[in-house]
């Protein structure tokens, strides 16, 4: 009798159960979401049930025994490889350099010699790798379970069935029991070709005598694949054949009842403590929720396949919505299999910790989920509601909100693991089990922390895009040079805890290299502004810290007058810093490119208030980060000219602590980099000196080792001191050493000459490269300007000076830049920029300004 059955193109465990009718497929989504999941939905119990049903065939018993033995060996080898991997990771973390062959791994039994030999089973060879070689995590995945099995478990039923089917002959025996009138040849052999020939005969027999088509059948490759999805295809066909002969094979339900009775007899309830009972309850909850999670992933996989088959969405868009879904399902099925096995043994014999140790590398599969989750949700909101679905197309998920809930499942599950492991640890009474659970807790916390960090980074990326459009004038800074955005919040800032000093609220953004302060733009400017006092300066402003550019050049910030503000002592950003410079918003060409490339960014922030850029504090010059009792951080900073402190007051202590730990880590990392740089410089200098000395006078070096050591120590200390002085001098204006640079062409102005400049004037030292001269060198000349002049007056004076010098034979001036105190040339293109330059000169008691014309 031919069995007419049809399998879904997307393989899942639920396909092993009776197929739903057409009306049941279109049930509301909440029924799919809330559908109860039992042990019959678990691959572990499905395989155990099939194995039990196959045992009724006496001809299969020797093949089942052989499959059991090969699965046991694979489990031992997996245990050995995992122990090697963990041992070598420990050696690497401790900085050791010993051969890993010295390790003594903890295995489930003593059959290491069997596992480390060359084996040939059912035509498949397993060759042990070099013990000293570090195995990849993919190479440690030899069975369909993760980690190390409990000592009372030799193998899992899933791996055993996989090894059974790879022998080929058992499939032919199954076929002959169902269709005895069309018997297939049964050849027991360890020759791989013979095994594949038997599998091929089985597939042809199913096509011819059971009316299977190619889509409903599996391939020879599926039988030998190390994949749960491909194994499920084989299980579907095997179970269909068994269900076609109820007189030979007992039903699934009856078999399950027999198995439950055997388990109850094997694990008769004993007198146990309350702690033990609580532990067992937590394990049951762990397994039940994991079954539900795997089932939800399979629902998503079916929905993904339906979308692909309907041509409503591209494969690229599908990957954005369901990244690594197939790999995640395969991993989580194996994870669940291991949980099911551990749940069958006593808590003292469980290896939950080993499960997490093996799985921690595979949890990285979820990185695309955490990174692209927000993008997927946005895509659903903007795209799926536009798609028209025919009445004939009935999706297993037909509600956008419920689909979003399914997409959140992976991240939610990963964040749930630490809570479950923590509960197990609290109820654990075995010392060995406790140690492994502690390791599992650390791993699960790191996983959840990594997921949250990825989501935070993704969200911060969107915040930076919005910030770019919200700021009215970036005053010459380039946001791409700030590093990654770490935190942002609305924070109150002051210089003391005194209630007499007013606090001012700013939007503060913490980047890797800089802290930026913003205030919201209002229609009426407030008359009062925040003043951050300095300890060693009479100026009522906050000096910015230092940050080095790619060449190690220092940068020091200063005050800048607030846009459209006439007389306020506001905190302002420097318009300099090569490592944190942004093209000036006054540059028309830059503005045009920015506007064209970021129109979407402005749309993102259309409903949010615009921001004024008010101040910056460089991470490089932060000294101390001290949490205060009133939800505040006391931040001290120091430069070569001045030092100071300010308070950031947050809304709650948790936010303060996050900022505090982040800032302290940034300072710590920066100091480590500086130490490594100094150490590298010292080592290079010492090595060079020693090598030179050895080449010049090898005899002296050999005969006077004390002198050599003394010189080496001196050189090292001198190099360290020199590096330290260089770091301290980072706040000074840098000097260009290139012969063609502007700085090398101009002469320093003496103090007498500087004092001769009137207080109301500023001396411009102008460098101008006139292209009409067909020369690459710059011409240098000076111009005395008045402080009361506006920007237009400056342009007229400069043009007049150049015209008189070159008899009107000049190229048009397209851009003007001035040199700030950091040594960087910043655009001078408006009255505001001119005011900033004058403030810089006044703050540094300078009367001359270097200018470049373009």
From Swiss-Prot:
One BP term from GO: septin ring organization
InterPro entries named in the record: Cdc24/Scd1_N, Cdc24/Scd1_PH_dom, CDC42_GEF, CH_dom, CH_dom_sf, DBL_dom_sf, DH_dom, GDS_CDC24_CS
SUPFAM superfamilies: CAD & PB1 domains, DBL homology domain (DH-domain), PH domain-like
Biased composition (Low complexity): 682-707
Keyword Membrane in record: no
Region (Disordered): 1-24, 542-571, 674-745
Pfam families: CDC24 (PF06395), PH_10 (PF15411), RhoGEF (PF00621)
GO CC annotations on file: Cdc24p-Far1p-Gbetagamma complex; cell cortex; cellular bud neck; cellular bud tip; cytoplasm; division septum; incipient cellular bud site; mating projection tip
GO MF annotations, alphabetized: guanyl-nucleotide exchange factor activity
Superkingdom of this protein's organism: Eukaryota
Domain spans labelled Calponin-homology (CH): 135-246
Location of the PH domain: 478-668
Annotated ranges, domain DH: 278-454
Domain spans labelled PB1: 761-854
Role: Promotes the exchange of CDC42-bound GDP by GTP. Controls the polarity of calmodulin, and the calcium regulatory process of bud emergence. CDC24 may be involved in the initial selection and organization of the budding site.
Subunit record text: Interacts with AXL2.
Protein name: Cell division control protein 24
UniProt organism field: Saccharomyces cerevisiae (strain ATCC 204508 / S288c) (Baker's yeast)
């Amino acid at each position: 009798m031919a069995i007419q059955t049809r399998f879904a193109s997307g393989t899942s465990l639920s396909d092993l159960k009776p197929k739903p009718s057409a009306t049941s497929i279109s049930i509301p989504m909440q029924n799919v979401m809330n559908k109860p999941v039992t042990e019959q939905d678990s691959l572990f119990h499905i395989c155990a049930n099939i194995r039990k049903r196959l045992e009724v065939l006496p001809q299969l018993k020797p093949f089942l025994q052989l499959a059991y033995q090969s699965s046991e060996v694979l489990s031992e080898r997996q245990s050995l490889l995992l122990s090697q991997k963990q041992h070598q990771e420990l050696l690497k973390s401790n900085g050791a350099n010993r051969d890993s062959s010295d390790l003594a791994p903890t295995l489930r039994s003593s059959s290491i010699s069997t596992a480390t030999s060359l084996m040939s089973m059912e035509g498949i060879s397993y060759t042990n790798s070099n013990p000293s070689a570090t195995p990849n995590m993919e190479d440690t995945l030899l069975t369909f379970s993760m980690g190390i099995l409990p000592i009372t478990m030799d193998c899992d039923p899933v791996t055993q069935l996989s090894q059974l089917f790879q022998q080929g002959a058992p499939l032919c025996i199954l076929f002959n029991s169902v269709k005895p009138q069309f018997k297939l040849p049964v050849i027991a052999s360890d020759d791989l070709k013979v095994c594949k020939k038997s599998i091929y005969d089985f597939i042809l027999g199913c096509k011819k005598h059971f009316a299977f088509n190619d889509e409903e059948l599996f391939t020879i490759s599926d039988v030998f694949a190390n994949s749960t999805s491909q194994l499920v295809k084989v299980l579907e066909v095997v179970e269909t054949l068994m269900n076609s002969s109820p007189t030979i094979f007992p039903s699934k339900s009856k078999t399950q009842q027999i198995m439950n009775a055997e388990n109850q007899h094997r694990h008769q309830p004993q007198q146990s403590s309350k702690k033990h009972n609580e532990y067992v309850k937590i394990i049951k909850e762990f397994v039940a929720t994991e079954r539900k999670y795997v089932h939800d992933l399979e629902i998503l996989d079916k929905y993904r396949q339906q979308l692909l088959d309907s041509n409503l969405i591209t494969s690229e868009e599908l990957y954005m919505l369901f990244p690594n879904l197939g790999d995640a399902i395969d991993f989580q099925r194996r994870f669940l299999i291991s949980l099911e096995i551990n749940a069958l043994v006593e808590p003292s014999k469980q290896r939950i910790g080993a499960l997490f140790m093996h799985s921690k590398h595979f949890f990285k599969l979820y990185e695309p989920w955490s990174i692209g989750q927000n993008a997927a949700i946005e895509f659903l909101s903007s795209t799926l509601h536009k798609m028209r679905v025919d009445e004939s197309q009935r999706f297993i998920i037909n509600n956008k909100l419920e689909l979003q809930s399914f997409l959140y499942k992976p991240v939610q599950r990963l964040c749930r693991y630490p809570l479950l492991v923590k509960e197990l640890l609290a109820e654990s009474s075995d010392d060995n089990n406790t140690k492994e659970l502690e390791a599992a807790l650390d791993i699960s916390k790191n996983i959840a922390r990594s997921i949250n960090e990825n989501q935070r980074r993704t969200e911060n990326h969107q915040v930076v895009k919005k910030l770019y459009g919200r700021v009215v004038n970036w005053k010459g800074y380039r946001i791409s040079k700030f590093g990654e955005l770490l935190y942002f919040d609305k924070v109150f800032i002051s210089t003391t805890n005194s209630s007499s000093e007013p606090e001012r609220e700013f939007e503060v953004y913490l980047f890797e290299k800089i802290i930026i302060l913003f205030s919201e733009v209002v229609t009426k400017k407030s008359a009062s502004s925040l003043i951050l006092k300095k300890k060693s300066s009479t100026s009522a402003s906050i000096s910015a810290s230092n940050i080095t550019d790619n060449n190690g050049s220092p940068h020091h910030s200063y005050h800048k007058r607030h846009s459209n503000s006439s007389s306020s002592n506001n905190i302002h950003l420097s318009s300099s810093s090569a490592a944190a410079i942004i093209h000036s918003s006054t540059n028309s060409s830059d503005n045009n490119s920015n506007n064209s490339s970021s129109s979407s960014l402005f749309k993102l922030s259309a409903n949010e208030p615009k921001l004024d850029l008010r101040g910056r504090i460089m991470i490089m010059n932060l000294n101390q980060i001290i949490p205060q009792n009133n939800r505040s951080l006391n931040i001290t900073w120091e430069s070569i000219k001045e030092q100071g402190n300010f308070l950031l007051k947050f809304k709650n202590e948790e936010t303060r602590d996050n900022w505090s730990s982040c800032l302290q880590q940034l300072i710590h990392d920066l100091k480590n980099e500086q130490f490594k740089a100094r150490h590298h410089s010292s080592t290079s200098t010492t090595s060079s000196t020693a090598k030179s000395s050895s080449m010049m006078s090898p005899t002296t070096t050999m005969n006077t080792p004390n002198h050599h050591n003394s010189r080496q120590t001196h050189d090292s200390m001198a190099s360290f001191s020199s590096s330290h002085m260089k770091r301290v001098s980072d706040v000074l204006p840098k000097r260009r050493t290139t012969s063609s640079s502007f700085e090398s062409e101009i002469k320093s102005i003496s103090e007498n000459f500087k004092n001769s400049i009137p207080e109301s004037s500023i001396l411009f030292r102008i460098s101008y490269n006139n292209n009409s001269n067909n020369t690459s060198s710059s011409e240098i000349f000076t111009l005395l300007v008045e402080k009361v002049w506006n920007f237009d007056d400056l342009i007229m004076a400069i043009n007049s000076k150049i015209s008189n010098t070159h008899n009107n034979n000049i190229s048009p001036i397209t851009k003007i830049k001035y040199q700030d105190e950091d040594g960087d040339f910043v655009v001078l293109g408006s009255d505001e920029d001119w005011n900033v330059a004058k403030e810089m000169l006044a703050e540094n008691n300078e009367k001359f300004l270097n200018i470049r014309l373009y």
